[in-house]
Amino acid sequence: ISDMGGDRPMMIAMLCLMVILIGFIFALSIVSKIQEESIIIGILLSNGYKKSELVFNYIANPIIITFSAAILGNILGYTYFTNSFKEVYYKSFNLPNFTPTFNLEALIITTIIPISIILIFNYLYIYKKLNFSPLDFLRKNLKHYKNHTKQKNEKNLKTHKNFLSIFRKSIIKSNKGDYIAIVLGIFITSILFIFGISAKPTFEDYGNKLKENLICSYQYILKTPTEVESKTAEKYTTIPASVYHKIRKTDEDILLLGINENSKYFNTKKLPKNKDEIIISEYLSKKLRKYIGDEITIKSKLLDKEKTYKIVDIYNKSSNLSAFVKKEFLNEEIERGKDFFNGYFSEEKLDIDERYIVTTINETSITNISKQLYEIMGPLINTFIFLSTIFLAGFIYSLMKIITDKNTIQISYLKIFGYTNTEISKIYIHPITITILISLIVLVPLELYAVKEIMYYSMLKFSGYLELYISAKTIISSIILTLTTYIFVSLLQFYKISKMNFNEILKNRE
């Protein structure tokens, strides 16, 4: 049951990423509005209005929208979606009847934190964008560059043969904030896609690795020493223990195993001869981020005492969070006789009364773990990919709309001068296309690093270690999904440009 909360950090991390992107869209939309209403802002500032008053006026709509969305989300979360997601847990856990009740922590995470992010981010961003004098607003001079640069660009526009190329560059410069937002948006949504698409292969790979890394076909943990007759059975000692996880700020449950010195099941590594040295499993090494040469303090749950060991090796063939020492050393540590044992390694099923068995680790039990994880996370992941696609489409459409809305007069002039819709799209849509293509390729290493780090921190609450399996197919699928979404949105934007009534726009301009 403790694993049921393991998906919370993951969902919270993704929620924060999406809220930050939404905050970017709001901010860029408001900046576009400020540029349109610069003369009005200049008049208001000249009449004594404070910048802070204007900021709150502009961020009111984003806050109202975010608040309304949060309220709607809470209503749906406590009603419609509750029934959908509780079935996921009923499939894997034997739980009592679930009745949703108000939860203050959920309100903070899903409502207060998103509203706070939108409020703080937009306030700081918009306040900076209003950092001009009233005269600058009245003149619509809202650029932080010197006049000689502008004069140089105007000269280039007049003399350069490739007018469209130079004009496109000027559009990119005037909308560089939007293009930066596109890069950030592609980065975050690519993380979401990679995470979602790699989920199923990850669970399959996790199950396969667990089976491959079994020490033996049957591993028994006993309540009390029980003798059996078997040629393949080998005795070992194990105790429940824990290590402090610095990032989680809590103890991580592990198994401490005492292995026979000449074990046929542990023959790939040489057991430490020093009582203060230890071998840890690869999964434990990765989860604690401790490596050869580091020290690890293990707390015995039986005797409630701690001992610090030096890590001398990493054991790759282990399916859980475990550590290994000589059996005689562990027996001495837990104040037992030299011949004490409470477990068996075996290549065949042993005839042991179930009353004396704590647990049996074999291929079937390991497979059930990976299946259970996918049953819990699978429906969430599919929903997650769908929502990420919708989110990406809305994000790109909003940014493209902002760019075209800011340049409607220029587009109208181009149409009057006889430029076709295709030529105009080369100015406004092609730079976005190039930006997205470059971002999809260049950002891949950073995306892989980010998604693995997010996965690591998100899965800290799980008992065990789960590592993302990201193949080339996953990366390609993510890129194709992003490009397909973008093509659909760009076609809509191209249609909007082709239907733009330039006569009406020029007639109504200031």
Where in the sequence are the language-model features?
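Short cytosolic juxtamembrane segments of multi-pass membrane proteins
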Residues: 131-148, 495-510
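Peri-transmembrane interface segments
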Residues: 1-20, 32-35, 57, 203-210, ...
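Hydrophobic alpha-helical segments
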Residues: 2-9, 20, 38-146
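Short helix-loop junctions at transmembrane helix boundaries
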Residues: 70-109, 128, 426, 437-504
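Small-residue transmembrane helix packing/gating motifs
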Residues: 214, 314-348
